[in-house]
From Swiss-Prot:
Biased composition (Polar residues): 344-356
Protein name as catalogued: Popeye domain-containing protein 2
Top-level taxonomy: Eukaryota, Metazoa, Chordata, Craniata, Vertebrata
Species of provenance: Mus musculus (Mouse)
Modified residues (Phosphothreonine): 364
Entry keyword Iron: no
């Protein structure tokens, strides 16, 4: 035991005895190999760090092979460095294969950066969502209909990637659908998985459009299997439907100067054109009900008389209850400027500032 300890101590504390040192240094290939190795071991993490690591170590070990073959003349040096060079090349090939497999088409890559990356959706989860739509991008020509009211069945969920889609009912324009908005989110939420239904609106492409579509059955299976994806779609669909409701509310404000409760079930009839002499009595009754709701607010301005500071107010004095302040109008989208001009918006805001209008008509026409 003592002999082994003494031999280890000699190896550690006594320098190796060299019979003779080389009078000259190694060749340029040897120093080039060490430079490659030094730069390679300074690589970072991640996929690109691995590309850098094995891309630099491979040439470094190859230079060691050349040095061992031409200068050192050692078979063991050549064999070990050949093995290390092959290992680096295999790692590079495996990295290239993984990158090619995980690469998405340009449309889906842009969709991920726009819609899912701000929500910190993992890329693997996004790939499952894309795989559910078979990674297909569908197109619509100008004035081509995506759905016809009363005819097209609700059997899919689609997301617009580019272009603009017009939504109408009975020929009456309702709102637009812009890129990265769902095209049929209200229809999707209106049905249970076991129910069948048809579109109540017509969707027409105003420009050349591209979109992706999930089959209804496949998407329901994915949502039932993956709870995270189900919550993600619930949040996205809820936000999309609220945006559509606010778009309708903005159009009402541009037309009447009023902001109605978005929970009303008959906004479509309020959006219909003004009643004329030749229209049916039902539409005239709708207009009269709307005027009856607006006229009291405009005929009774709010006036508060200040009370002298010395006299105490009587016990039975009823102070006027302030009405809720109307919300400021939402800014229209860049492509939907023709929904309302700036002049009606300004006039409507002045009317709202002078007299507070009710949130909704008193008598709402039924569908």
């Amino acid at each position: 035991m003592s002999a082994n300890g003494s031999s280890v101590a000699q190896l550690l504390w006594q320098p190796p005895v060299c019979r003779s040192w080389k009078p000259d240094v190694e060749g340029a290939v040897y120093h080039l190999a060490n430079c490659f190795l030094l730069m390679g071991f300074m690589a970072g993490s991640g996929v690109y760090g691995c590309f850098y690591l094995f891309g630099i170590l491979g040439p470094g070990y190859l230079c060691c092979v050349l040095w061992g073959w031409f200068d050192a003349c050692g078979l063991d040096i050549v064999l070990w460095n050949v093995l290390l060079t092959v290992a680096c090349l295999l790692q590079l090939a495996q990295l290239v294969y993984r990158v090619r497999v995980n690469t998405l088409p340009e449309e889906f890559n842009l969709l991920y950066r726009t819609l899912c990356l701000p929500l910190q959706v993992p890329l693997q989860v996004y790939k499952e969502i894309v795989h559910c739509c078979h990674e297909q991008v569908l197109t619509l020509a100008t004035e081509q209909t995506y759905a016809v009211e009363g005819e097209t069945p609700i059997n899919r969920l689609s997301l617009l990637l580019s272009g603009r889609v017009r939504v109408s009912q009975d020929g009456q324009f309702l709102h637009y659908i812009f890129p990265y908005q769902f095209m049929d989110s209200p229809e999707w939420e209106s049905l249970h998985p076991s129910e069948e239904g048809t579109f109540q609106v017509t969707l027409t492409a105003e420009t050349e459009c591209s979109y992706i579509s999930w089959p209804r059955k496949n998407l329901y299976l994915l949502l039932n299997r993956e709870r995270y994806i189900s919550r993600l779609f619930s949040a996205l669909l809820g936000y999309d439907i609220s945006e559509k409701l606010y778009t309708l509310n903005d159009k009402l404000f541009a037309k009447f100067g009023l902001r109605f409760d978005i929970r009303l079930p008959s906004l479509y009839h309020v959006l219909s054109p003004s009643a004329s002499d030749g229209e049916p009595e039902s539409e005239k009754d709708d207009e009269e009900a709307l005027e009856a709701a607006v006229s009291p607010a405009q005929a009774r301005p709010i006036c508060i008389v200040p009370t002298p500071p010395c006299s105490a107010p009587p016990a039975t004095t009823n102070f006027p209850v302030p009405l809720p302040r109307a919300r400021m109008p939402r800014m229209p989208r860049p492509d939907s400027g023709n929904l309302a001009s700036r002049r009606p918006l300004q006039n409507s805001s002045q009317v709202m500032s002078r007299s507070q209008a009710p949130l909704a008509p008193i008598h709402t026409p039924e569908l």
